[in-house]
């Protein structure tokens, strides 16, 4: 846990009122926190995020649950890639949608684009990716993300409806130095980014995450 985080928690406990610390926050999250997240994303990745693009959640799991509900109705499908985090199944099933899984490219665990394009049918309203990936640890390259975006844009135009890209990113910062780890939203405009500080700052018990759109 970062030392600055612990010191700030102690400072807040000593200086803030119990109501401010433990009362209900606004439904979208505390404004100053949303603003800080937006500023950080814009500074690090060069995209024009504003407070209005950020929705605070209880970790990435809640962020994903909200994202799935936002882009599906019963009978729709979400397409993801093997191997994947097993809890995606119940999260999607609760919406009445179906999780379809593209088999892995066993040579390097990047995307098998032939299989992906075949399975990206009209009932798919969102594609779900997780990079760096749990459980494989694979990181999608910039070339992989660009080709993914190209196919999704082509299919969205063909079907006449949006296809959203839901990017599950709790491991975003946990990569080796020099690894090509692109920020997904830079390559596809209809990206819904789901993030958690549980891994990057080792704060799983705090349940702090967000959706960025």
List the predicted regions and their residue ranges.
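A short helix-loop-beta submotif of the ANL/AMP-binding
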Residues: 93-100
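Active-site PLP attachment segment
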Residues: 173, 183-213
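Conserved coil-to-alpha-helix start sites within the AMP-binding
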Residues: 60-65, 84-88
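Conserved PLP-anchoring active-site segment centered on the Schiff-base-forming lysine
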Residues: 70-92
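N-terminal small-domain helix-loop-helix segment of the aminotransferase-like
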Residues: 1-58
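Active-site phosphate-binding strand-loop segment of PLP-dependent enzymes
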Residues: 106-177
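Short acidic capping loops at alpha-helix termini that bridge into adjacent secondary structure
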Residues: 49-54, 75-77, 123, 161-162, ...
